[in-house]
């Protein structure tokens, strides 16, 4: 089956809204084995939309629309597409009552123009919206299908999961199973190592890049659930063989979820001391339900005085080695662990830019510490692109990776170890600093 994704809304063409719906649907359709041939954005104009739909019907089997289902005059998707599929719309009292009830619950008056949202296909069928007021629609003509969903991302995703995806699966006479591997590292390196596995047709595998990691989504099609699952699992094993422990988990939302679960399993706690990341690590941890069982203290120590007062960094160490240095990162991590009484603590100090930096410490230089027991491990990170948001995101990701390796009982890669007992020793700190400056 082939498909096109059509996003409707002049606001998208003006750049006022980021179109995340198309990205989401591309991945979801690919996971169903449906080939997306084109993604398009059309403004709120009946004539142009109708012309486009009639052309697109000749190119593919399925049209997937988002947007233009609301109550205003420029919400034209439903009536336009209905006409292109030889259908009409009729008022649905049940949908109208749902709309009235929704407005009543939220303490608002239902205006007459909202009746437009209660218009549903006569020959096609409505698609229930359990999370908003605009129902979707499904049209068919001569074996060609069109599905219409709201433009609001959370409504669209819920409708896809609850209604549209099952409809499409039922039409394929097969079942699908997917596994998403979470892999630490850059896209080009990971893709090169597994490139021959990406050419398979069943199961399929696709890589999606994120900051500091990638997702590999493996999808198998078979006649039964158990067969599809076995195919997926067997193919996933091939990726594990090639990537080793760079694969840190499966089917999780991110590194923080795996870290929190690992800390729970091991009965460990964690603390953070952040400078340039300004609480991003703590935020990611607390995004995970149940994080309070393992995370109790997060120190944001942006000023030098805060580093000294809150996590015990010696002012003399800052003066001698610079606030962005390995000795400071080490003392921050050890101090955070002690102040919080935590088993593990991570620290970050760096230059996120765009201002500041010099030849020794250019913008993008970050030092991280990861303390556990009697040892602190220090790592230097350099983000070559001087993008403040990217530097901070990479730093937070790296800190979580260091913490995960310690929680797993492993020594983090590419780090220098410093004994807790030597954290005030001038010669040891100088040697640590020199090691990174030489590198």
Task: Show where each model-derived region lies.
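Short alpha-helical segments enriched in small residues
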Residues: 227-439
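Accessory alpha-helical/coil subdomains and C-terminal extensions
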Residues: 140-212, 217-219, 227-232
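Proline/glycine-rich low-complexity loops and linkers
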Residues: 48-51, 75-171
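Glycine-rich oxoanion-binding loops at beta->alpha junctions
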Residues: 26, 30-55, 91-132, 306-344
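Conserved hydrophobic helix-helix packing surfaces used for dimerization/oligomerization
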Residues: 3-5, 146, 270
């Amino acid at each position: 089956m082939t498909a096109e994704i059509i996003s409707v809304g002049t606001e998208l063409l003006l750049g006022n809204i980021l179109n995340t719906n198309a990205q989401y649907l591309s991945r979801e359709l690919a996971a169903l084995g449906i080939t997306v041939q084109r993604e398009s954005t059309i403004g709120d104009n009946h004539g142009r939309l109708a012309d486009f739909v009639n052309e697109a019907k000749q190119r593919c089997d399925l049209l997937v629309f988002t947007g233009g289902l609301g109550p205003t005059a420029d919400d034209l998707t439903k009536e336009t597409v209905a006409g292109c599929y030889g259908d009409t719309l009729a008022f649905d009292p049940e949908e109208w009552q749902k709309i009235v009830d929704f407005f009543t619950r939220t303490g608002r008056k239902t205006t007459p123009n909202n009746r437009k949202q209660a218009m549903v296909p006569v020959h096609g069928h409505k698609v229930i919206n359990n999370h908003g007021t605009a129902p979707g629609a499904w049209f068919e003509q001569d074996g060609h299908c069109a599905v219409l969903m709201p433009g609001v991302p959370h409504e669209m995703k819920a409708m896809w999961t609850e209604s549209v995806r099952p409809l499409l699966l039922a039409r394929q006479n097969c079942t699908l199973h997917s596994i998403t591997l979470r892999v630490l590292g850059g896209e080009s390196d990971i893709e090169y190592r597994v490139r021959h596995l990406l050419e398979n047709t069943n199961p399929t595998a696709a890589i999606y890049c994120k900051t500091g990691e990638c997702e590999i989504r493996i999808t198998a099609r078979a006649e039964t659930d158990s067969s599809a699952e076995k195919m997926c699992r067997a193919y996933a094993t091939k990726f594990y063989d090639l990537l080793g422990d760079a694969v840190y988990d499966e089917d999780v939302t991110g590194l923080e979820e795996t870290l929190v679960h690992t800390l729970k399993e091991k009965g460990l706690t964690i603390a953070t001391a952040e400078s340039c990341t300004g609480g991003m690590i703590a935020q990611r941890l607390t995004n995970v339900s149940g994080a309070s069982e393992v995370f109790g203290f997060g120190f944001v120590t942006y000023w030098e005085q805060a580093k000294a007062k809150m996590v015990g960094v010696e002012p003399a160490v800052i003066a001698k080695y610079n606030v962005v240095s390995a000795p400071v990162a080490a003392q921050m991590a050890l101090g955070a662990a002690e102040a919080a009484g935590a088993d593990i603590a991570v620290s970050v100090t760096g230059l996120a830019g765009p201002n500041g930096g010099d030849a020794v410490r250019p913008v993008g230089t970050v030092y991280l510490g990861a303390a556990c027991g009697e040892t602190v491990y220090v790592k230097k990170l350099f983000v070559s692109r001087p993008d403040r948001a990217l530097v901070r995101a990479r730093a937070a990701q790296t800190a979580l990776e260091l913490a995960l390796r310690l929680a797993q009982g492993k020594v983090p890669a590419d780090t220098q170890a410093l004994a807790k007992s030597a954290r005030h020793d001038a010669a040891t700190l100088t040697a640590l600093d020199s090691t990174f400056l030489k590198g």
